[in-house]
């Protein structure tokens, strides 16, 4: 309880900052422009092909924002060309995008000011201790061998976009900033559609990456806050009073509604939630909740999560979005892999004096395989091959130079090998390399209007070297005098490269153009 109250006090301190006046400062938009150009993932600035920053247009925007009818016209006529009171498409896009990027920069300031310094790092509660993506797969190798059941969770989505604004109310009490956020959401979703509208969802994500990430992280952190807090501090649920939770907006009202639906819920001792060997891992919109407990315990957790998220957080959680699996009998899709924990049987002959007998030993092994079907489907959608995996040429790249074409195909191949280097079976990767290599050859042959055989003979070993991976280059240096060398021996080697910062685009077909 003291940890929760301490966290609530920190949240209080974050509410003292009013950031709306910063939107009238020109340097905020210049900073947003520099972030878009120099960030880890460069994006097209303001949705236009022109990446130049115009301080004159920014000054005009700030002057228009001071006008009394600026926001009135924008809100009353969101679907017309009068958005931001300007009919020119260029100014329309520029103003909306620059406001979105600037707002995303400004709204992050209260949260960053509330973060503890290095000297206060020891005071951070344990349930806020998050780990980097670099540690996910080593963690799975170490822990999953000792666990029994797994819940594969698709993180629920809010029923209405207004919930995204309400989630920020207890962190930011700057009312004008919240109204501005409603304006952006109203513009991209017409304010009447659900967040499940994939068209408006991806449009908002594409054109407002920084703002989208901020909203999504705030939304997920709210969901995980209750999940992890109740997991590690579940003894507090034995209390009948809800006074401790009053720092949450509308929490008491939701508790009364929940009390009507489930009378006596908080009076029961939920001792069955206390499982010291439960582990939580999340990446993007998926999460894993693994435990050593029984199947009954996992079913109770599933029921609890569904009811809790719906009645307390207004998150639309369908029961089928939480799938229960036994680790030894199934595999699950996570981070572009198909991990599983199969049981391998090993017969050992034991000799004792004149008697010998066999011992049946069962051993668990964390196994990660490459999803062949999804990767081939992604290559097919990207027009590198047919649906059955037959390589084809890529006509849209024939206007590039030969070396640019070779570099693009080779980079995709090396990235696939690099990302899936921890797979226990890599034969599918060599099949993907064959598809990309032949697709590259056919693209070059189509460009020069020749046959694949003729083009391959002209390039020779230079063509093959572009598709060499790191481990193959090491083998080539060790065996430079060997004319024939097979890399099949490296299929079983597993190396987790720790420079993976995001999932490969080919793993998620939705990211392909």
Curated annotation (Swiss-Prot):
Places the protein is found:
Plastid, Chloroplast
- Source domain of life: Eukaryota
Q: Identify the main location.
A: plastid
Q: What does this protein do?
A: Usually encoded in the trnK tRNA gene intron. Probably assists in splicing its own and other chloroplast group II introns.
Its protein name is: Maturase K
Keywords, A to Z, come to:
Chloroplast, mRNA processing, Plastid, RNA-binding, tRNA processing
Which Gene Ontology BP annotations are present? mRNA processing; RNA splicing; tRNA processing
> What organism does the UniProt record list as the source?
Panicum capillare (Witchgrass)
**PANTHER family attached to this UniProt entry:** MATURASE K
What is a GO molecular function of this protein? RNA binding
Give the InterPro entries listed for this entry: Domain_X, Maturase_MatK, Maturase_MatK_N
Instruction: Give the Pfam families listed for this entry.
Output: Intron_maturas2, MatK_N
Disulfide connectivity for this sequence is none
Belongs to which family? Answer: Belongs to the intron maturase 2 family. MatK subfamily.
Q: Which GO terms describe its cellular component?
A: chloroplast
């Amino acid at each position: 309880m003291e940890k929760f109250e301490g966290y609530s006090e920190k949240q209080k301190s974050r509410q003292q900052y009013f950031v709306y006046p910063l939107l009238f400062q020109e340097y905020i938009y210049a900073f947003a422009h520099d972030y878009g150009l120099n960030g880890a993932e460069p994006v097209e600035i303001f949705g236009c092909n022109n990446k130049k920053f115009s301080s004159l247009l920014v000054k005009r925007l700030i002057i228009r924002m001071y006008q009394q009818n600026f926001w009135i016209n924008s809100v009353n006529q969101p679907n017309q060309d009068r958005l931001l009171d300007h009919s020119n498409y260029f100014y329309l896009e520029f103003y909306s995008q620059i406001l979105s990027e600037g707002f995303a920069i400004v709204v992050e300031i209260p949260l960053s000011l509330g973060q503890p310094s290095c000297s206060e790092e020891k005071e951070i509660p344990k349930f806020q201790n998050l780990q980097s993506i670099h540690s996910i797969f080593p963690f799975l190798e170490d822990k999953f061998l000792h666990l029994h059941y797994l819940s594969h969770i698709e993180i629920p989505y809010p029923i209405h976009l207004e919930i995204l604004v309400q989630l920020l109310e207890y962190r930011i009490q700057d009312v004008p900033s919240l109204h501005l956020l409603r304006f952006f959401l109203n513009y991209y979703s017409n304010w009447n559609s659900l967040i499940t509208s994939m068209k408006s969802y991806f449009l908002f994500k594409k054109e407002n990456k920084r703002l989208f990430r901020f909203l999504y992280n705030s939304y997920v952190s709210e969901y995980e806050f209750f999940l992890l807090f109740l997991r590690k501090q579940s003894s507090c649920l034995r209390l009948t009073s809800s006074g401790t939770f009053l720092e949450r907006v509308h929490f008491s009202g939701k508790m009364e509604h929940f009390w009507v639906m489930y009378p006596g819920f908080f009076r029961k001792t939920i001792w069955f939630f206390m499982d010291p060997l439960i582990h939580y891992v999340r990446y993007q919109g998926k999460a894993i909740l693994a435990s050593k407990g029984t199947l009954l315990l996992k079913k109770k957790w599933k029921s609890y999560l569904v009811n809790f998220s719906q009645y307390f957080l207004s998150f639309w959680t369908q029961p089928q979005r939480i799938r229960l699996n036994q680790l030894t009998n199934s595999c699950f899709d996570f981070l572009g892999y198909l991990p599983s924990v199969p049981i391998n049987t090993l017969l050992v002959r034991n000799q004792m004096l004149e008697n010998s007998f066999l011992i049946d030993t069962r051993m668990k092994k964390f196994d990660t395989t490459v999803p062949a079907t999804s990767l081939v489907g992604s290559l097919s959608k990207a027009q590198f091959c047919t649906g059955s995996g037959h390589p084809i040429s890529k006509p849209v790249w024939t206007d590039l130079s030969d070396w640019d074409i070779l570099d693009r195909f080779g980079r995709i191949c090396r990235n696939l090998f690099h990302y899936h280097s921890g797979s226990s079976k890599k034969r599918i990767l060599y099949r993907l390399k064959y598809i990309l290599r032949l697709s590259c050859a056919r693209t070059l042959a189509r460009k020069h209007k020749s046959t694949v055989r003729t083009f391959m003979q002209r390039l020779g070993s230079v063509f093959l070297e572009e598709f060499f991976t790191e481990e193959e280059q090491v083998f080539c240096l060790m065996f430079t005098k060997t004319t024939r060398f097979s890399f099949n021996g490296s299929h079983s080697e597993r190396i987790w490269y720790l420079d993976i910062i995001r999932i490969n685009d080919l793993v998620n077909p939705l990211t392909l153009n």
